[in-house]
């Protein structure tokens, strides 16, 4: 309908504005700090922090660019999935180590509820990308709460559960989160945890390339759980 088309166009316009802002902000920060270092405007005892901030902003830019590149690769069927068996628990331990500081910066506690080794059949790098993206979303929309990751065996599949005690979503929001241009809470787009909005559509497509499934359970004001299943089979998917 015309109304639906108008909504999509407005989401696209807002997405482009957000993406431009999210690219410009780290570039401006990096440029300002470089000028400060060049002209010795940053005190000696603050230079280390300035360098760390530039590294963080550079990583943020790389992530934004990679998300856009991945989305285009998926859209044009140029991405390859090579599924192998690996220790999923160990992979999740590494993710928790990687993201704990970010979670704690938002007042959150990040837990891995699985201790026994459990094998996963997946493309290792894409598995990590899927889990990291969802955990980062949980951090973004949770304050002074908890985020739990669990791994379990199902029937001919391995299941990852990622739950948080964050703001939650309505049924309408759950239906829309896979839209490339949709944001669950536009009012939070300028927080220091803001992302480009491409993450969940990429996650959904990567899970589909694994012949897996992704489901969401959420209650407004109480939190969200993502349930991702990976079949126990080795495949190569173009």
Where are these regions (language model features)?
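Conserved micro-motifs of the catalytic ATP-binding
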Residues: 76-81, 119-122
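Conserved catalytic submotifs in the C-terminal HATPase_c
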Residues: 82-87, 104, 109-118
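Short alpha-helical segment of the dimerization/phosphotransfer core of two-component systems
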Residues: 56-62
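Short conserved segment of the HATPase_c
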Residues: 169-183
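Short acidic helix/loop segment immediately C-terminal to the autophosphorylated histidine
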Residues: 38-45
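Short helix-loop "hinge" at the ATP-lid/N-box region of the Bergerat-fold HATPase_c
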Residues: 138-139
């Amino acid at each position: 309908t015309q109304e639906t088309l108008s909504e999509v166009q407005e989401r696209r316009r807002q997405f482009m504005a957000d993406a431009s802002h999210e690219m410009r902000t780290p570039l401006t920060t990096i440029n300002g700090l470089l000028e400060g270092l060049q002209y010795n405007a940053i005190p000696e005892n603050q230079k280390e922090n300035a360098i760390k901030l530039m590294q963080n902003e550079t990583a943020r830019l790389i992530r934004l660019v990679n998300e856009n590149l991945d989305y285009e690769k998926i859209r044009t069927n140029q991405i390859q999935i090579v599924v192998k068996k690996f220790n999923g628990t160990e992979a999740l331990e590494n993710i928790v180590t990687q993201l704990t500081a970010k979670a704690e910066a938002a007042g959150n506690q990040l837990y891995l509820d699985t201790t026994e080794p459990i094998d996963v059949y997946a493309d290792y790098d894409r598995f990590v990308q899927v889990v990291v993206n969802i955990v980062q979303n949980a951090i973004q929309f949770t304050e002074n709460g908890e985020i739990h990751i669990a791994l379990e065996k199902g029937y001919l599949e391995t299941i990852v559960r990622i739950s948080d005690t964050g703001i939650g979503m309505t049924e309408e929001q759950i239906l829309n989160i896979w839209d490339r241009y949709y944001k669950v809470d536009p009012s939070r787009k300028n927080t220091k945890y803001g992302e480009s909005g491409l993450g969940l559509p990429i996650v959904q497509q990567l899970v589909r390339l694994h012949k897996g499934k992704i489901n969401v359970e959420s209650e407004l004001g109480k939190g969200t759980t993502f349930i991702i299943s990976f079949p126990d089979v080795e495949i190569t998917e173009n």
